[in-house]
Amino acid sequence: MPASSVRLPLRLLTLAGLLALAGAAALARGAPQGGPPSPQGGPAPTAAPARGPTLFVLVGDGSAWFVFQLGGLGALNDTRIRGHLLGRYLVSYQVVPPPVSAWYFVQRPRERPRLSGPPSGAELVAFDAPGVRRTYTTAAVWPAEVAVLADAEARCPAAVFNVTLGEAFLGLRVALRSFLPLEVIISAERMRMIAPPALGSDLEPPGPPAGRFHVYTLGFLSDGAMHQTMRDVAAYVHESDDYLAQLSAAHAAALAAVVQPGPYYFYRAAVRLGVAAFVFSEAARRDRRASAPALLRVESDARLLSRLLMRAAGCPAGFAGLFDGRAERVPVAPADQLRAAWTFGEDPAPRLDLARATVAEAYRRSVRGKPFDQQALFFAVALLLRAGGPGDARETLLRTTAMCTAERAAAAAELTRAALSPTAAWNEPFSLLDVLSPCAVSLRRDLGGDATLANLGAAARLALAPAGAPGAAAATDEGAEEEEEDPVARAAPEIPAEALLALPLRGGASFVFTRRRPDCGPAYTLGGVDIANPLVLAIVSNDSAACDYTDRMPESQHLPATDNPSVCVYCDCVFVRYSSAGTILETVLIESKDMEEQLMAGANSTIPSFNPTLHGGDVKALMLFPNGTVVDLLSFTSTRLAPVSPAYVVASVVGAAITVGILYALFKMLCSFSSEGYSRLINARS
């Protein structure tokens, strides 16, 4: 007989027994009998109101749960009811291990500084819709009626992450397949435990002394690390009432969970995210409004961080939404259009031009050493890799690879270390996207010696899919642990795993720098490089029939400078600098006439990568052409004259004519004076 067929009669017997016990308890007290509540937890319309405290029992087998109203709390002393409470179909008291008095928490959580609020002039949206009344049930606390404002869940066989936001209420559940679960409840009202009669009927769940809210942490006290985690997360909500500070802490905690996989980091990051959303919703609920950029920021961060956390737990899932339709209806500022398109999974076609322009502008600023918006770049890259054509994806990766320099990777690593510091203070907003972009979404892998950056890159590439896309919320049991396709690898599938750096070309081929020769494709061994770190430049493609196993040496040349101001001869070429130590210093895509002129300006160039005076004598340069030609660049044969405007030519001609006229007049004056002077002298003598 199937197991499900056996469980059904047992459930019915259990329900019947509980109803009988309820009737017996009610008759013993002389109280009117009431009908059972609905499966959703609400009382039946015909139920009479209970007198005094009422006992609720949570019944279920994991797939469905029901709440039944039995009677007064004194019924707990009934051995028959106690037997049911300890039965197979009911929850266990051991969720919170006794003695509760042994638990201790941080007494006065430290306050973090308040960050700047929404930008001035930001459009405000109403946040005054009442929550939907629901009964919140848990394993060890009596059910509570909550006005739910938001409810989100990410689930797969490896992990479950659930957040319920209500009016002055947060319920958060986290569970991992290989570790014990954790639950956090934040409430304005005091709550009571479902505890054995020996502990009393008015026992408060474990938590720190009440501040603005009551905070309860429920879990199995398995070891000291779990105990410390439960103590720490209980203090989060009282650390700051600024949602930006809480979001910054959530990003840092998610960063720790991604680079240092483990249940405790996962739990801390999940609670941080839930608390950040709770602090924001409470502020918006009290003010009855919220700024549109702030609501979009919280919504997008919730979806992004939940996906990164679930990915770290081993499954492709994440929140499909937090504030339901509230965030989707907000007006979007021009600067937030890419974030909104990624967050809500909108049709990306209307945003592709904006995404291309964002990547191009970020690249132009990066080449000139100027700061750029790394968060906007992340969302632009996400849209182009997922919705753009093959040409869009490859050109985007070419630019992000060029933007990923050793200096930028070092800055990201330093930012990561600072964020992971236990003494980090969020004086300024911190976002994971400032660490992820652009190196994590590029084809540069030689800077990934730090496992932190390598883990971040893998997580970031899998988070590029739009958060609102179908299947982003939860994974089914059948396909939950199937590996998601890496959009970066999909855009350039020909690149081998051992590549240090790759530069995709149009047509399905790529320039690839490696330490050893690939199995297929022409390869150039770069001379003057340390034999311990050799550099090989190969051209690889997916066309196995065209495999050319040819070893070559790049030809050293003085390339001609172009004098044509209207033709860009070296556009779409890639300029590469590398050192004799076998290190790739930088790559620059020449995409405009202005960049070409800067390239040929030599020591006068304002682009640092092109200026040879900023590099030592052991640094060499290559020019990679789109047709696969590789040149060891020595110099340009001549310096191109600066373009002269027509107005300057006219002014020069007029000035020269005036100068000639003045000189001629002076000459005539001198000649006339000399002629008259000699005539007078001759006449005087005669």
UniProtKB/Swiss-Prot annotation:
This protein's major location comes to virion
- Pfam families for the chain: Herpes_glycoH_C
The UniProt entry's GO CC annotations, sorted and at most eight, read: host cell endosome membrane; host cell plasma membrane; membrane; viral envelope; virion membrane
GO aspect biological process, one term: symbiont entry into host cell
Task: Give the Virion surface membrane side ranges.
Answer: 25-646
Please verify whether the record's keywords include Protein transport.
no
TM regions (residue ranges): 647-667
The organism sits in which domain of life?
Answer: Viruses
Q: Which HAMAP family match?
A: HSV_GH (MF_04033)
User: Its family?
Assistant: Belongs to the herpesviridae glycoprotein H family.
So what does this one do?
Answer: The heterodimer glycoprotein H-glycoprotein L is required for the fusion of viral and plasma membranes leading to virus entry into the host cell. Following initial binding to host receptor, membrane fusion is mediated by the fusion machinery composed of gB and the heterodimer gH/gL. May also be involved in the fusion between the virion envelope and the outer nuclear membrane during virion morphogenesis.
**Designated name of the protein:** Envelope glycoprotein H
What is the protein's species of origin? Suid herpesvirus 1 (strain Kaplan) (SuHV-1)
Gene label: gH
